[in-house]
């Protein structure tokens, strides 16, 4: 399944706020889950499905990519759900978004694809690149690249950068301080339900 490219407002009306997908916050419609709970099996499946969809649309990844992340998380030490969130949060496109270099993850992904982003010096054009503690995120020393980032940083300064990241506004340089903890996740999500959804597939 490919990435969603349709109307974003329709998605957040159904799933709730997804800051990675869009910064719009329209009035939410009543969830179909709360309207019909007569069949418990279907209701629980829908709840797990919607939590899974939240991750997919927020981080802008395909179904196959999410399944692969779940499989990796299952093999790692620690809570599968927490490791899954850490893997998604440490993607380069998401780190750029959380640093405030672009207001959405799809926009941040374009910055990476168009070769505007450097990690520890070299250009990295892979949005799924896994950032690590002490990685430096910078932009190409070109007028166009700097103009794009500067405009977004000024807009995004009103939002708090999470503790696992630091951004130097003068040097236009981001730093990954550490692997983030659960409290720093920028999305309202129950990751255990996502793990349960994939329990028979991963």
Curated annotation (Swiss-Prot):
Family in the record: Belongs to the universal ribosomal protein uS4 family.
Organism (species): Cyathophorum bulbosum
Keywords per UniProt: Chloroplast, Plastid, Ribonucleoprotein, Ribosomal protein, RNA-binding, rRNA-binding
GO MF terms, alphabetically ordered: rRNA binding; structural constituent of ribosome
Function: One of the primary rRNA binding proteins, it binds directly to 16S rRNA where it nucleates assembly of the body of the 30S subunit.
CC annotations in GO: chloroplast; small ribosomal subunit
Pfam family, one: S4
Gene Ontology annotations of biological process type: ribosomal small subunit biogenesis; translation
Listed InterPro entries: Ribosomal_uS4, Ribosomal_uS4_bac-type, Ribosomal_uS4_CS, Ribosomal_uS4_N, S4_RNA-bd, S4_RNA-bd_sf
Name of this chain's protein: Small ribosomal subunit protein uS4c
Localisation per UniProt entry: Plastid, Chloroplast
Residue ranges occupied by any S4 RNA-binding domain in the UniProt entry: 90-153
Chief place of localization: plastid
Oligomer and partners: Part of the 30S ribosomal subunit. Contacts protein S5. The interaction surface between S4 and S5 is involved in control of translational fidelity.
